[in-house]
Amino acid sequence: MKRIVIDPDICNGQPVIEGTRITARTILEFLAAGDTVEDVLEEYPSLSKEDVLECLRFSAELMKNHYRLQDLV
C-alpha cells in the first residue's frame, strides 16, 4: 500500500493516509454510511480519489486473512 502508512507516533499507530492524520478507518466509515467518494473528497479536500480508493484496497487486503467470526463479535 503506497498511500497508507502505519506509524506508532501518528494516531496511535492506526493506518493513515500518508502525509495526513486521516485514518483509513475514517474514510471507510464515511463510505459505509453511504457517502460517495465525491462526498469524502468534499469533506477532506486535501485527499485525492486515489487516496480514498487506496483505503478500500487496504481494507480488502486485510479481509484476505482468515478470521473466526465468533472471535470478532
Task: Identify the meaning behind each predicted range.
Residues 1-16:
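Short, Lys/Arg-enriched N-terminal segment that forms or immediately precedes the first helix
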Residues 4-6, 26, 51, 68:
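Exposed, low-complexity/repetitive linear segments and helix-based recognition motifs
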Residues 10-13, 25-29, 57:
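N-proximal short alpha-helices
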Residues 23-53:
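Amphipathic, hydrophobic secondary-structure cores in small proteins
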Residues 46-73:
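C-terminal structural segments of small proteins and small subunits
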